[in-house]
Amino acid sequence: MADKEAAFDDAVEERVINEEHKIWKKNTPFLYDLVMTHALEWPSLTAQWLPDVTRPEGKDFSIHRLVLGTHTSDEQNHLVIASVQLPNDDAQFDASHYDSEKGEFGGFGSVSGKIEIEIKINHEGEVNRARYMPQNPCIIATKTPSSDVLVFDYTKHPSKPDPSGECNPDLRLRGHQKEGYGLSWNPNLSGHLLSASDDHTICLWDISAVPKEGKVVDAKTIFTGHTAVVEDVSWHLLHESLFGSVADDQKLMIWDTRSNNTSKPSHSVDAHTAEVNCLSFNPYSEFILATGSADKTVALWDLRNLKLKLHSFESHKDEIFQVQWSPHNETILASSGTDRRLNVWDLSKIGEEQSPEDAEDGPPELLFIHGGHTAKISDFSWNPNEPWVICSVSEDNIMQVWQMAENIYNDEDPEGSVDPEGQGS
């Protein structure tokens, strides 16, 4: 009986999702300056823009690159580098180019040929997460379904993978007992990599100190303060010895690598009422960070007084799995997760007065809801070179590259012609 009910609920939910997506598609010309929808061969659990951009002479587009992965059903997995052509501001831009069938829009007409897979490298199992090293973006670390963290220099691998499926990482980092997701390169110390694991620990490696012939590197330090699965870890962006971690024990911990005590963090705070899945330090303000949780909220913190939560962002309907500050605006952050939505928030609008109609759509700090995905969003990344451009990937193989309409983040349109959900006002 329960099975029948579940099947009925699933069918109803699918109908609702499809209806919502139709409405979203109809409204994209008003909500976005750019939407590119691309179906990957396999879903990617990870997405990160590489820092480089090419601007070909005489062309009306620039070329950007992304690090992706695969999550296959028992077939060979790959670490993937893809290129994306984004239209320049002066590209022929016309809302009538919107292709309602494809859900693509933004000057370009069709996206075919605008997104290409450039490099595929054999990988052991799915790529839980892949992140490039800031000091040398050719070097990419990956989290696997095993306890190993792998490091690849993609310039040393052919762009077409060996058909044997053999995975040959340049380094294999040991120290964990289980898999995980969290991964963070130190932006101030080249080669210092942190990883979070289901085994309740955080490992630190220094790959700059690796002997030339050694392929296996043991963790330099293992941090053991959490009492449950560690979901995410992140270096502070300015202080080379500080990092934060979050876990299923509902805690946010701040660590200092100069401390001799690897089982006790400098600070530990009960951050949420459920598992904490992600964290992000603000790139402009050295004391500010955000955490995202299974309690459906994003919390804002000040390192100078962690006893007090600065703010709680509430609008998500389900678990939050990723939170990232904008690289271009210190008050802007985004969050995504199981509810298929990516929310963009603006701290500067906290506490603003709202009409009752506006309040129904969400709090004043909720700037935009990206409603283009019809499955859980696994990861997203702000483009470092094009403000307001985001790449998001979902569990149903869909990758979207999009940019909200300028009148939404530039307050020149006080009337607010369209509300953030895209239902029109």
From Swiss-Prot:
The yes or no answer to whether the keyword Cell cycle is present is: yes
Tell me the residues on which N-acetylalanine occurs: 2
Cross-link type Glycyl lysine isopeptide (Lys-Gly) (interchain with G-Cter in ubiquitin), residue numbers = 4
Its Gene Ontology cellular component terms are: CAF-1 complex; chromosome, telomeric region; ESC/E(Z) complex; nucleus; NuRD complex
- WD repeat copies, ranges: 32-125, 126-175, 176-223, 225-270, 271-314, 315-371, 372-404
Give me any GO biological process, just one. DNA replication
Residues with N6-acetyllysine modification? 4, 160
The UniProt similarity line reads: Belongs to the WD repeat RBAP46/RBAP48/MSI1 family.
Which protein is depicted?
Histone-binding protein RBBP4
User: Which species does this protein come from?
Assistant: Pongo abelii
